[in-house]
Amino acid sequence: MGTTDYGLSALLVLLAILLFVIQPLAEIGIAGRFVSSLFFSLMLVSGVWAVAGNRSSATAVGVLVLSALTVRWARLLSGNGSLVLSSVLAYVFCIVVAAIVLAQVFRKGRITFHRVRGAVAAYLLIGMAWAFAYETVALEWPGAFVFPDARTVEPEGLISHFVYFSFVTLTTVGYGDVTARHPIARSLVTIEALIGQLFPAILLARLVSLELLHRDKEVADEEIRG
């Protein structure tokens, strides 16, 4: 088992902490933007570890991580830096790492717990990617989304709302408390809902087929040795 398999598990753990612990605490004021940014940075670095087995992929992801961290921390510490650029870089990072992680999960061989966790991490990365895409649209076209009670949300607070909205859309729950009004926003929502329907079915079928292929190969090897 390669070290990158352990990287998949580490990526999932950090994603889960960021999404389900740090993000809500940051929204209610218990964990500040510094803590949220720190865990986001750790998640970015773990993404590099998760793809470290492929040098070219690790280099590309490393450049993305360095760019995203520079823009994010420059904005946090000095107030400089574009929030739109930060969102775009984070979106690209999530998409690229999700694609590389899935390639790792679907490679030949036994399906380990680490690879299953990698598949879950890829699913969470897709949800995060769309959250950043929604944030970008909302920043470029104010009013693209309608929030509960028609209240106005500050730019810095958009991402917490869109993380929630993204995963509600991805799991096709659709509570309807946040509504997409801009055509581009609606298109993104439709695409994410389709991914939410297709991803689990395709993932399960592929993992089962890989495990069966591996078992058949083991049986064939035993027969040859016997």
Report each predicted region and the residues it spans.
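N-terminal membrane topogenic signal
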Residues: 1-13
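Central hydrophobic cores of alpha-helical transmembrane segments in multi-pass inner-membrane proteins
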Residues: 16-19, 37-49, 96-99
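Short, hydrophobic transmembrane alpha-helix segments
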Residues: 20-34, 47-55, 77
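Structural signature of hydrophobic alpha-helical transmembrane segments
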Residues: 24-40, 60-62, 83-95, 160-163
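Outer-pore turret/helix-boundary of cation channels
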Residues: 25-28, 127-164
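Cytoplasmic-side transmembrane-helix entry/capping segments in multi-pass membrane proteins
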Residues: 55-66, 83-92, 111-122
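Pore-domain transmembrane helices of cation channels
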Residues: 97-143
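Pore domain of cation channels
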Residues: 156-218
